[in-house]
Each structure stands twice: as structure tokens, then as C-alpha cells.
């Protein structure tokens, strides 16, 4: 073995010109699609959402409590629409109880654990499905009363009770997938969330899981509403009824407000990126997150707008509310109308006029 004499070598011979050596400090370029996606959130946006949630909570409690109070204080038998509106107000009140929890989760993340995640998610879904199913039932009731000028079916109160029970049962069934798969999750780079967890195939299974409930709990009732209210409007135009202008305002409000409040959220949540209609990137994921927040607020607002649309616009509701206030001494009886009827949904079985 040959011996190497290291005394004949210098560092420059071994490693070259160290002083003039250049180091490559540049990091390799990482594609945007491969980079970890950190959710973008601003504290000011979080607190703005919380303020809106509190506002919806207060308006929801006040408006729907008044609706329930006026219906229950009525001294005559309730009309069919009264029963539907009573159930609608109860559904909105149940949803209102979850708003403080959603407000806290916007700031702190989901800190309430899996059981409460399942419960509040269930109440939110039941409120949505029961709301649109009840509205579809109201549209069918108006359709029968005005287009066919008959109340023979809808005047049977026990049928109305069974219909409402069926709506609550169907809403619960449509909401079960959310209840089963929702849990508290701690994702990387963000706060804990309340979301569906179905393993490695969450995205594909979520599409399947949402397709059936959205079809029977959103699209079908919406088509029923559009069909019934469309024919109702045509009948009002052709008959030249005295109350048609008021009825048209309320009917347009029913359809337009529901579409404005819930259609954007369902479009963003259940199509687009989540249905892989557009390519998923980090930036688009954050954009979709912000869009979900904005459209979800619109959907939440619908729960407190219902009393304004289906009750406060109606003259009979105002008369009923004034009677209650006069009975408790809050206002003078001089303010009471002389010919106010107890039912706040002013429908008539003798003709097709309606003051919805």
C-alpha cells in the first residue's frame, strides 16, 4: 500500500480556492398547488361576523317569539297557514339557540368538542330543510285556495298536523348524514373546526352524501314553490282581485328572499370546488372559504327575516300584536282597529282573496 505524504498538499490543492467559492443559497421552487395551504383570516373579519351573528340572534328571538305569541294568543281556531308559520317560527328559534356557539367558533375555532359539533350541526340542517319544506307547504296551500278556490283538503286540521310531523321527520332524516359524520377536527396550520370526517375519501363521499338531501330538501321544494306561486300569480292577474297587489308583493318576497338567502350558499357549498367543477388551489380554497362565510350569513339572516315576510307584512298580524299589547296595558285600546280579525294570515275560505 502506497503511503501519501500530506505535507506536500495545501488546503487549496484539496478544496480549491475557498475564498472565491460561491454557495447556492436559493431554495427550490415549490409549485403553488404543492405548498401547504394556510387559511387566510383577518381578526377584523372574524369580529364583524360575530357582530352579525349577534344581530341575527336578537332579531330571530324577538321576531319569531312575537309570531308564536300572536298565534297562540289567537282566540279562534288557527288557519292552516297559521299552523305552518308556527312550526316555521319554532324551527327558526331552535336554530337561534346555536348562533352564540357558531359566533364563538368564528373567533376561537371549534373548542366545544365532537358531541356539541354534532348537535348544533343537526339543528342547523333541520332548520334549513324544515324551513323550505314548510314554505313549500304554504305555497301549495295558497295554490289550492286561490287557483282552485278550495279549502276542502287543507281545512282538515288533523291532516295539517300530520303534514307538519312528516316535515319534521323528513328534515331529521335528511340531516342524519351530517349528524353521523360531523366531528371536531384539528387540521394543520389552522384552528379546530367542526366538519365531516369520512377518512381518505372525504371529498368523494361528501358529494354523494349531499346529493340526495339537496335534491329532496332543496331543489324539489324550490320547484314546488316556483310552480305554485307562478300559477297563483297568473290567477290573481286574470281574476283582477282587489287584494292582488298585496298578495303579489308577499309572494314575490317569499320566493326572492329565499333565493337570495339560501341559493348562493348552496351554490358555493355543494358545487364549484367541492363538486370539482373548478380546479382546487390554495388561493381558490381561501376564496371559497370567504365566500362560504358571506353566503352563510345570508342564509342565517333568512331565519330572522321570516317574521317580517310572512307576518309583519300582513295586516292581521299587526292587529293581533296590538291586541296583545292592549291586553297587557302597554298601549291604549284606542289604537286597536275596529274590525281586526284574530288570524294574522288573513285567508278566506269563501273566496280566493288573501292577505298573506
Swiss-Prot record:
Membrane topology, record value: Multi-pass membrane protein
SUPFAM superfamilies: Family A G protein-coupled receptor-like
Gene3D superfamilies according to UniProt: Rhodopsin 7-helix transmembrane proteins
Entry keyword Electron transport: no
Family: Belongs to the G-protein coupled receptor 1 family.
One Pfam family linked to the record: 7tm_1
Protein name from the UniProt record: C-X-C chemokine receptor type 2
CC per GO annotation: external side of plasma membrane
A GO MF label: C-X-C chemokine receptor activity
The keyword Isomerase is assigned to this record: no
Organism, scientific name: Canis lupus familiaris (Dog)
Glycosylation sites: 8, 20
GO biological process: calcium-mediated signaling; immune response; neutrophil chemotaxis; positive regulation of cytosolic calcium ion concentration
Bilayer-crossing regions: 47-73, 83-103, 119-140, 162-181, 207-229, 250-269, 291-311
Main location: membrane
Parts of the chain on the Cytoplasmic side: 74-82, 141-161, 230-249, 312-356
Amino acid at each position: 500500500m502506497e503511503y501519501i505524504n500530506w505535507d506536500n498538499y495545501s488546503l487549496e490543492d484539496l478544496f480549491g480556492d475557498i475564498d472565491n467559492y460561491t454557495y447556492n443559497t436559493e431554495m427550490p421552487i415549490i409549485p403553488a398547488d404543492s405548498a401547504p395551504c394556510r387559511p387566510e383570516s383577518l381578526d377584523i373579519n372574524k369580529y364583524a361576523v360575530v357582530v352579525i351573528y349577534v344581530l341575527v340572534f336578537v332579531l330571530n328571538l324577538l321576531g319569531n317569539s312575537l309570531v308564536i305569541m300572536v298565534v297562540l294568543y289567537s282566540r279562534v281556531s288557527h288557519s292552516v297557514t297559521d299552523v305552518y308559520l308556527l312550526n316555521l317560527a319554532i324551527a327558526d328559534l331552535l336554530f337561534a339557540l346555536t348562533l352564540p356557539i357558531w359566533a364563538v367558533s368564528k373567533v376561537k375555532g371549534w373548542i366545544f368538542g365532537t358531541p356539541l359539533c354534532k348537535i348544533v350541526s343537526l339543528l342547523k340542517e333541520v332548520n334549513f330543510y324544515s324551513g323550505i319544506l314548510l314554505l313549500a307547504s304554504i305555497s301549495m296551500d295558497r295554490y289550492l285556495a286561490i287557483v282552485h278556490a278550495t279549502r276542502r283538503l287543507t281545512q282538515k286540521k288533523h291532516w295539517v298536523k300530520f303534514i307538519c310531523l312528516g316535515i319534521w321527520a323528513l328534515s331529521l332524516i335528511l340531516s342524519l348524514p351530517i349528524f353521523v359524520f360531523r366531528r371536531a377536527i384539528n387540521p394543520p396550520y389552522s384552528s379546530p373546526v367542526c366538519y365531516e370526517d369520512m377518512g381518505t375519501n372525504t371529498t368523494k363521499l361528501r358529494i354523494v352524501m349531499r346529493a340526495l338531501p339537496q335534491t329532496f330538501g332543496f331543489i324539489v321544494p324550490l320547484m314546488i314553490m316556483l310552480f305554485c306561486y307562478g300559477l297563483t300569480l297568473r290567477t290573481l292577474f286574470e281574476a283582477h282581485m282587489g287584494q292582488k297587489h298585496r298578495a303579489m308583493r308577499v309572494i314575490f318576497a317569499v320566493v326572492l328572499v329565499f333565493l337570495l338567502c339560501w341559493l348562493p350558499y348552496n351554490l358555493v357549498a355543494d358545487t364549484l370546488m367541492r363538486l370539482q367543477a373548478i380546479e382546487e388551489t390554495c388561493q381558490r380554497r381561501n376564496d371559497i372559504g370567504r365566500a362560504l362565510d358571506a353566503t352563510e350569513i345570508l342564509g342565517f339572516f333568512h331565519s330572522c327575516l321570516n317574521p317580517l315576510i310572512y307576518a309583519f307584512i300582513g295586516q292581521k298580524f299587526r292587529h293581533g300584536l296590538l291586541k296583545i299589547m292592549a291586553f297587557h296595558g302597554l298601549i291604549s285600546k284606542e289604537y286597536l282597529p275596529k274590525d281586526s280579525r284574530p288570524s294574522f294570515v288573513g285567508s278566506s275560505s269563501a273566496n280566493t282573496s288573501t292577505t298573506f
